[in-house]
């Protein structure tokens, strides 16, 4: 099973949070560029992001911990000084579509209420009560 990085239970929903951090100062420029290329491909959504969300949901469901709506949040530590980085355009919609239909038929049950892709500054504006910052 592949699981998301964090599961946060709020009063009215459960946040499934996946963090991708190619802006880490320890990341080489080659690795960063490779990540950006991968981000543009179907592979990133289909093989990296969706299985983590689905598997995390499956675990919560089997443990009877899925009684609240689920929101999948992907935090990409890229281009922190823009509100809507070019690379994010379309990524969120591709993610939502794939979460609803992985095969030929749509899932009969939608297991995620919403999915959003944010950078850290966008996260901090939207979730100011749980601000995020780099510590290393």
Question: Model-predicted segments: where are they?
Answer:
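Catalytic cores of nucleic-acid endonucleases
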Residues: 22-77
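Short, low-complexity, polybasic intrinsically disordered segments
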Residues: 70-127
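General secondary-structure propensity
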Residues: 41-45, 121, 129
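Flexible, glycine-rich phosphate/dinucleotide-binding loops
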Residues: 15, 25, 81
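Structural motif
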Residues: 13-15, 71
């Amino acid at each position: 099973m592949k699981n998301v990085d964090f599961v946060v239970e709020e009063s009215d929903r459960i946040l499934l949070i996946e963090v991708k951090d190619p802006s880490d100062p320890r990341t080489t420029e080659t690795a960063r560029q490779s990540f950006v290329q991968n981000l543009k491909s179907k592979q990133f959504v289909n093989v990296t992001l969706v299985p983590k969300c689905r598997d995390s949901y499956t675990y919560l469901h089997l443990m009877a911990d899925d009684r609240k709506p689920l929101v999948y949040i992907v935090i990409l530590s890229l281009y922190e000084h823009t509100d809507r980085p070019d690379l994010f355009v379309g990524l969120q919609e591709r993610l939502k579509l794939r979460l609803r239909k992985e095969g030929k038929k749509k899932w009969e049950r939608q297991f995620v209420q919403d999915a959003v892709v944010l950078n850290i500054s966008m996260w901090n504006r939207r979730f100011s009560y749980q601000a995020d910052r780099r510590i290393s």
